């Protein structure tokens, strides 16, 4: 009997997302419920954004939650390497096979040619897509251009008509017209694969039997199915999971909700409660109980109990569930966990240099730096009153800084300062006009330790969370303001 093998394949391009943890949990439970294996693979072909620091954060976040893997970059295994950036020769080999078999072709179109092509298609009211012009090149012309070293990509051929039937374990057969599919790029001009080729090749070579992924990938499933057909490989069973939603039913995003697993760890949530809550996202226990462990979820896991309605990720409900777990801890374990969360040496060493020179007794540390150990702050609206800025300008400054910080790939003091500086310059203000607002939002105080150091220590999600808190306190942002300020944001370097 074939061993069930599932996987999670996150990209190390930022903080570990709760959506990644959610999909990882369901893949893990499905594999373990069937006595199978769960694999961790790293999709790091985006060389500009991928970092080893983000990769380590993924490892740490999943392990904090209690999700372990049988094979992966850090534990090894018989199907490695498990980083896509280390599998380039493998992808090149299989891409060449597709070209030789007539299922893919070389495309030498420049970015300017492609942009002009799309513009002309849009002007005609057509859906922009690659028009197949490289297919008209003769074999001799293709070889000449390859020999000359011209930049190129490899694209797959797709049918221009007909229906592709996608067998989904949740929805049954889903019919998707082929005329919605583009001639997908498989290998980029830097020699790295795109998601489609890398996933099909890796899933096959790693013996993946079942793929549980987010439903945002369902519309492009025909491309994956066609690649399996071209290679002559057996296709894994496919399951497209419902996406997590904000309370307003929009797709979960860091603009409306903290999305980093690290944020919830820093906020003092228990990993058991976090897993429990993610397990309730569209799934339920047979007896409908709300509180259950990972082991209990594995024991009773059944895909038929997944609801297709978009599950709502609500911090208030997560907090309620966390309280259930917290209050049931033996008091000794409660004390141990509290000490580990608040007073662990790594975190204290980040904070100590910033408070030591400002206190005369240890009892003064809490009033000065207590905000380091809090989640949501009790903010005072009076702290946001400015002699120079109007109430609308105060909200504008905070909102623009919040948006600007969302674009940061590396969370460092110098880059944080740069974001704030860019906003105040665009608004023709001084740094001293914005910093009191940052102190009020981030520390809940008029003055404290360096707020820029505090933002770096607290991390991106908790910092942004507190800025959103401040905006809510001050009345939020109207749709009209949101539209106007986003235009202004686009002009800020």
UniProtKB/Swiss-Prot annotation:
GO cellular component, one term: cytosol
EC number(s) recorded for this UniProt protein: 6.1.1.17
Entry's Gene Ontology molecular function annotations: ATP binding; glutamate-tRNA ligase activity; tRNA binding; zinc ion binding
Xref: Gene3D superfamilies: 1.10.10.350, HUPs
Keywords of the record: Aminoacyl-tRNA synthetase, ATP-binding, Cytoplasm, Ligase, Nucleotide-binding, Protein biosynthesis
Annotated Pfam families: Anticodon_2 (PF19269), tRNA-synt_1c (PF00749)
Residue intervals passing through the bilayer: none
Subcellular location: Cytoplasm
Top-rank taxon: Bacteria
Short sequence motif 'HIGH' region: positions: 10-20
InterPro entries (alphabetical): aa-tRNA-synth_I_cd-bd, aa-tRNA-synth_I_codon-bd_sub2, aa-tRNA-synth_I_CS, aa_tRNA-synth_I_cd-bd_sf, Glu-tRNA-ligase_bac/mito, Glu/Gln-tRNA-synth, Glu/Gln-tRNA-synth_Ib_cat-dom, GluQ/Sye
GO biological process: glutamyl-tRNA aminoacylation
Segments carrying motif 'KMSKS' region: 251-255
Residue sites binding ATP per the record: 254
UniProt entry tagged with the keyword Protein biosynthesis: yes
Catalytic function, reaction form: tRNA(Glu) + L-glutamate + ATP = L-glutamyl-tRNA(Glu) + AMP + diphosphate
Stated family: Belongs to the class-I aminoacyl-tRNA synthetase family. Glutamate--tRNA ligase type 1 subfamily.
Subunit structure: Monomer.
Function, in words: Catalyzes the attachment of glutamate to tRNA(Glu) in a two-step reaction: glutamate is first activated by ATP to form Glu-AMP and then transferred to the acceptor end of tRNA(Glu).
HAMAP family found in the cross-reference section: Glu_tRNA_synth_type1 (MF_00022)
Protein name, UniProt field: Glutamate--tRNA ligase
């Amino acid at each position: 009997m074939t061993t069930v093998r599932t996987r999670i394949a996150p990209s190390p391009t930022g903080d570990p997302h709760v959506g990644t943890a959610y999909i990882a949990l369901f893949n893990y439970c499905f594999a373990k419920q069937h006595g199978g294996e769960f694999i961790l693979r790293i999709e790091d072909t985006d060389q500009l954004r991928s970092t080893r620091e983000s990769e380590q954060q993924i490892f740490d976040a999943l392990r904090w939650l209690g999700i372990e893997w049988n094979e992966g970059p850090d534990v090894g295994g018989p199907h490695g390497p498990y980083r896509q950036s280390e599998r380039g020769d493998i992808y090149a080999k299989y891409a060449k096979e597709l070209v030789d078999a007539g299922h893919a072709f070389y495309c030498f179109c420049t970015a300017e040619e492609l942009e002009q092509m799309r513009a002309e298609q849009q002007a005609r009211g057509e859906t922009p897509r690659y028009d197949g012009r490289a297919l008209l090149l003769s074999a001799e012309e293709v070889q000449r251009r390859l020999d000359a070293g011209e930049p190129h990509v490899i694209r797959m051929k797709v049918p221009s008509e007909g229906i592709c039937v996608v067998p989904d374990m949740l929805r049954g057969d889903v019919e998707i017209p082929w005329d919605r599919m583009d001639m997908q790029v498989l290998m980029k001009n830097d020699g790295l694969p795109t998601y489609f080729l890398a996933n099909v090749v890796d899933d096959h070579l790693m013996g993946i039997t079942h793929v549980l992924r987010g439903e945002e990938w369902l519309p492009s499933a025909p491309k994956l199915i066609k690649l399996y057909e071209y290679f002559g490989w057996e296709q894994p069973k496919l399951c497209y999971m419902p996406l997590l939603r904000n309370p307003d039913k929009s797709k979960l995003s860091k603009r409306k909700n903290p999305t980093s697993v690290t944020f919830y760890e820093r906020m003092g949530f228990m990993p058991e409660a976090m897993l429990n809550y993610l397990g309730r996202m569209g799934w339920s226990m047979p007896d409908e109980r709300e509180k259950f462990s990972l082991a209990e979820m594995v024991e009773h896991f059944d895909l038929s109990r997944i609801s297709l309605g978009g599950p709502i990720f609500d911090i208030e409900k997560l907090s309620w569930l966390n309280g259930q777990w917290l209050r049931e801890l033996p008091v000794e374990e409660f004390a141990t966990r509290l000490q580990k969360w608040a007073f662990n040496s790594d975190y204290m060493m980040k904070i100590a240099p910033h408070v030591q020179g400002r206190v005369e007794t240890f009892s003064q540390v809490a009033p000065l730096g207590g905000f380091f150990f809090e989640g949501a702050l009790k903010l005072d609206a009076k702290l946001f009153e400015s002699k120079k800025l109007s109430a609308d300008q105060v909200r504008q400054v905070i909102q623009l800084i919040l948006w600007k910080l969302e674009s940061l790939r590396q969370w460092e003091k110098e880059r944080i300062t740069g974001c704030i500086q860019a906003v105040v310059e665009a608004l023709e203000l001084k740094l001293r006009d914005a910093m009191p607002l940052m102190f009020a939002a981030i520390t809940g105080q008029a003055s404290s330790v360096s707020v820029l150091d505090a933002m770096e220590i607290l991390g991106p999600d908790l910092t942004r969370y507190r800025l959103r808190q401040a905006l809510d306190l001050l009345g939020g942002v109207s749709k009209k303001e949101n539209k106007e300020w986003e235009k202004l944001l686009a002009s800020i370097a």
